[in-house]
Design a protein with these regions (language model features):
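Gly/Ala-rich beta-loop-alpha elbow adjacent to hydrolase catalytic centers
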Residues: 138, 142, 146
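A conserved cap/lid and substrate-binding interface adjacent to the catalytic center
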Residues: 39-137, 154-159
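A generic structural signal for ordered secondary structure
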Residues: 10-12, 65, 148
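Sec-dependent N-terminal signal peptides
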Residues: 2-12
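Sequence contexts marking disulfide-bonded cysteines in secreted/extracellular proteins
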Residues: 22-24, 31-33, 40-45
Length: 159
Protein backbone atom coordinates (compact mmCIF):
# COMPACT_ATOMS: atom_id res chain seq x y z
CA UNK A 1 0.00 0.00 0.00
CA UNK A 2 1.22 3.40 -0.89
CA UNK A 3 0.20 6.20 1.38
CA UNK A 4 0.97 9.75 0.53
CA UNK A 5 0.95 12.11 3.43
CA UNK A 6 1.27 15.80 2.83
CA UNK A 7 1.10 18.51 5.39
CA UNK A 8 0.97 22.20 4.63
CA UNK A 9 1.98 24.18 7.65
CA UNK A 10 4.53 26.84 8.40
CA UNK A 11 6.63 24.54 10.61
CA UNK A 12 8.54 21.43 9.67
CA UNK A 13 8.53 18.28 11.78
CA UNK A 14 11.01 15.50 12.37
CA UNK A 15 9.77 11.99 11.63
CA UNK A 16 7.19 11.00 14.21
CA UNK A 17 5.86 7.46 14.05
CA UNK A 18 2.72 8.36 16.03
CA UNK A 19 1.96 11.16 13.58
CA UNK A 20 2.39 8.79 10.63
CA UNK A 21 0.07 6.23 12.24
CA UNK A 22 -2.44 9.00 12.89
CA UNK A 23 -2.38 9.98 9.20
CA UNK A 24 -2.69 6.35 8.11
CA UNK A 25 -5.79 5.99 10.30
CA UNK A 26 -7.21 9.21 8.88
CA UNK A 27 -6.72 7.95 5.32
CA UNK A 28 -8.16 4.53 6.22
CA UNK A 29 -11.24 6.05 7.85
CA UNK A 30 -12.38 7.51 4.51
CA UNK A 31 -13.36 3.99 3.45
CA UNK A 32 -15.78 3.33 6.30
CA UNK A 33 -17.42 6.70 6.99
CA UNK A 34 -20.74 7.33 5.25
CA UNK A 35 -22.12 10.22 7.32
CA UNK A 36 -20.74 12.85 9.68
CA UNK A 37 -22.64 11.16 12.52
CA UNK A 38 -20.94 7.79 11.94
CA UNK A 39 -17.42 8.50 13.20
CA UNK A 40 -17.08 5.14 14.93
CA UNK A 41 -15.18 2.74 12.69
CA UNK A 42 -12.08 0.86 13.87
CA UNK A 43 -9.63 3.50 12.57
CA UNK A 44 -11.69 6.60 13.39
CA UNK A 45 -9.95 8.60 16.10
CA UNK A 46 -11.49 10.70 18.84
CA UNK A 47 -9.15 13.60 18.04
CA UNK A 48 -10.99 14.12 14.75
CA UNK A 49 -14.05 16.31 14.33
CA UNK A 50 -15.57 15.21 11.04
CA UNK A 51 -17.42 18.12 9.45
CA UNK A 52 -17.97 17.25 5.78
CA UNK A 53 -18.14 14.27 3.47
CA UNK A 54 -17.79 15.47 -0.11
CA UNK A 55 -18.89 13.07 -2.86
CA UNK A 56 -19.55 13.51 -6.56
CA UNK A 57 -19.29 11.15 -9.55
CA UNK A 58 -17.53 8.47 -7.51
CA UNK A 59 -14.95 10.82 -5.98
CA UNK A 60 -14.90 11.30 -2.22
CA UNK A 61 -13.11 13.21 0.53
CA UNK A 62 -13.69 13.85 4.19
CA UNK A 63 -12.93 17.18 5.87
CA UNK A 64 -12.86 18.55 9.36
CA UNK A 65 -10.65 19.51 12.29
CA UNK A 66 -7.87 17.40 13.77
CA UNK A 67 -7.17 18.14 17.45
CA UNK A 68 -4.02 15.96 17.37
CA UNK A 69 -2.29 18.33 14.92
CA UNK A 70 -4.45 21.38 15.65
CA UNK A 71 -5.17 21.66 11.95
CA UNK A 72 -7.88 21.30 9.37
CA UNK A 73 -7.72 18.10 7.36
CA UNK A 74 -8.73 16.67 4.01
CA UNK A 75 -8.49 12.92 3.46
CA UNK A 76 -9.09 11.03 0.22
CA UNK A 77 -9.72 7.28 -0.15
CA UNK A 78 -8.21 5.14 -2.84
CA UNK A 79 -10.16 3.48 -5.61
CA UNK A 80 -13.36 1.99 -4.27
CA UNK A 81 -15.78 1.89 -7.19
CA UNK A 82 -15.92 1.35 -10.95
CA UNK A 83 -15.83 5.09 -11.66
CA UNK A 84 -12.52 5.37 -9.76
CA UNK A 85 -10.97 2.54 -11.76
CA UNK A 86 -12.06 4.16 -15.01
CA UNK A 87 -10.34 7.37 -13.85
CA UNK A 88 -7.21 5.37 -12.94
CA UNK A 89 -6.70 4.14 -16.50
CA UNK A 90 -6.98 7.60 -18.08
CA UNK A 91 -3.21 8.01 -18.04
CA UNK A 92 -2.76 10.59 -20.78
CA UNK A 93 -1.25 13.74 -19.32
CA UNK A 94 -2.84 17.18 -19.32
CA UNK A 95 -1.64 20.62 -18.20
CA UNK A 96 -4.67 22.19 -16.51
CA UNK A 97 -2.62 24.92 -14.84
CA UNK A 98 -1.22 26.47 -18.03
CA UNK A 99 2.37 25.71 -17.11
CA UNK A 100 4.84 22.87 -17.32
CA UNK A 101 3.03 20.80 -14.67
CA UNK A 102 1.50 17.67 -16.18
CA UNK A 103 -1.12 15.56 -14.45
CA UNK A 104 -2.71 12.29 -15.47
CA UNK A 105 -6.14 13.15 -16.82
CA UNK A 106 -8.03 10.61 -14.71
CA UNK A 107 -6.49 11.78 -11.43
CA UNK A 108 -7.29 15.38 -12.26
CA UNK A 109 -10.87 14.55 -13.26
CA UNK A 110 -11.43 12.61 -10.04
CA UNK A 111 -10.12 15.56 -8.00
CA UNK A 112 -11.97 18.17 -10.03
CA UNK A 113 -15.36 16.50 -9.38
CA UNK A 114 -15.14 17.57 -5.72
CA UNK A 115 -12.67 20.47 -5.80
CA UNK A 116 -15.16 23.33 -5.61
CA UNK A 117 -17.03 21.96 -2.60
CA UNK A 118 -13.78 21.16 -0.78
CA UNK A 119 -12.42 24.70 -1.26
CA UNK A 120 -15.70 26.20 -0.03
CA UNK A 121 -15.63 23.89 2.99
CA UNK A 122 -12.02 24.81 3.77
CA UNK A 123 -12.95 28.47 3.77
CA UNK A 124 -15.76 27.77 6.25
CA UNK A 125 -13.56 25.56 8.42
CA UNK A 126 -10.76 28.15 8.48
CA UNK A 127 -13.19 30.66 9.96
CA UNK A 128 -14.82 28.18 12.36
CA UNK A 129 -11.55 26.87 13.81
CA UNK A 130 -9.48 30.03 13.32
CA UNK A 131 -6.54 28.23 11.75
CA UNK A 132 -4.85 28.02 8.37
CA UNK A 133 -2.94 24.82 9.17
CA UNK A 134 -3.93 22.04 6.82
CA UNK A 135 -3.22 18.32 6.72
CA UNK A 136 -3.92 16.59 3.40
CA UNK A 137 -3.67 12.82 3.18
CA UNK A 138 -4.86 10.04 0.92
CA UNK A 139 -4.35 6.45 -0.12
CA UNK A 140 -3.54 5.33 -3.68
CA UNK A 141 -5.83 7.35 -6.00
CA UNK A 142 -6.46 9.51 -2.93
CA UNK A 143 -2.72 10.17 -2.69
CA UNK A 144 -2.75 11.51 -6.24
CA UNK A 145 -5.76 13.67 -5.42
CA UNK A 146 -4.03 14.90 -2.23
CA UNK A 147 -1.00 15.92 -4.29
CA UNK A 148 -3.15 17.84 -6.78
CA UNK A 149 -5.04 19.55 -3.97
CA UNK A 150 -1.76 20.55 -2.33
CA UNK A 151 -0.64 22.19 -5.58
CA UNK A 152 -4.02 23.93 -5.88
CA UNK A 153 -3.96 25.21 -2.30
CA UNK A 154 -0.41 26.53 -2.64
CA UNK A 155 -1.43 28.42 -5.79
CA UNK A 156 -4.81 29.64 -4.53
CA UNK A 157 -3.45 30.75 -1.15
CA UNK A 158 0.28 31.44 -1.57
CA UNK A 159 0.60 33.08 1.84
Amino acid sequence: MILLILIIISLSYAYDENFVKHCVNLAQSTYCVTSTEEWNCKTCESSIKLEYIVENSGSKAIQGFDKYTNSLFVSFPGSSNLHNWIENIQVNKISPYNNSVEIEKGFYKAYNFIKKDMIINLSLLTKKYNTNKLLITGHSLGGAMATIMTYDILNLFPE
